[in-house]
């Protein structure tokens, strides 16, 4: 099980990175709203 986790961890990290890059404009908008509300 641990070996499987070691194998899939980089794959999951890569997918998360791709999703992060795709949603970057949405994240920037979220950060703008969040920082605006944080004041």
UniProtKB/Swiss-Prot annotation:
GO terms for molecular function: manganese ion binding. It is a single-pass membrane protein. Its main location: membrane. It is found in: Cellular thylakoid membrane. The keyword Transmembrane applies. The chain crosses the membrane at residues 4-22. GO terms for biological process: photosynthesis. It holds the Pfam family PsbY. Keywords: Membrane, Photosynthesis, Photosystem II, Thylakoid, Transmembrane, Transmembrane helix. It comes from the Bacteria. GO terms for cellular component: photosystem II; plasma membrane-derived thylakoid membrane. Loosely associated component of the core of photosystem II (PSII), it is not always seen in crystals. PSII is a light-driven water plastoquinone oxidoreductase, using light energy to abstract electrons from H(2)O, generating a proton gradient subsequently used for ATP formation. PSII is composed of 1 copy each of membrane proteins PsbA, PsbB, PsbC, PsbD, PsbE, PsbF, PsbH, PsbI, PsbJ, PsbK, PsbL, PsbM, PsbT, PsbX, PsbY, Psb30/Ycf12, peripheral proteins PsbO, CyanoQ (PsbQ), PsbU, PsbV and a large number of cofactors. It forms dimeric complexes. HAMAP family: PSII_PsbY. Belongs to the PsbY family. This is Photosystem II reaction center protein Y. It comes from Prochlorococcus marinus (strain MIT 9515).
